[in-house]
């Protein structure tokens, strides 16, 4: 793997990232921005701190926690990714085995986005509301992520343990029958 910053030369490179996924800090609302040394980024590099001071920033304890997550051991990252792949594969395989659903393998998130084939409800939003009402399984309607690509889908998180995912998927399967 070669980072874009190494091959960019003097072309501008701006990296935006957060701590939610890799550092398990979902909901802490902290991220960072990094620049390469391109002279074209001078005005941005100079003025961004001014903008950051105007906006409400993440509280100080969270900033220190984020710093420690970078300084501390990183071995958990590969273990976490490996476990997430197992959960992802479990969820995708189960979803694809349920009549009326089809799901591609996600490659960069901890969500699956199955397509609802022959939806008996008028919309994907109605589908997820009925799923919640009848089973207690909470998902998010796909059209909430944009009508063009999201309609007819729903989003399910595969962060919970396999036992919890299995329970939820059993409920989804019963709901789809």
Map each language-model feature to its residues:
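Helix N-cap motif at beta-to-alpha junctions
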Residues: 118-121, 161-163
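Short beta-strand segments
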Residues: 17, 32, 105, 113-115, ...
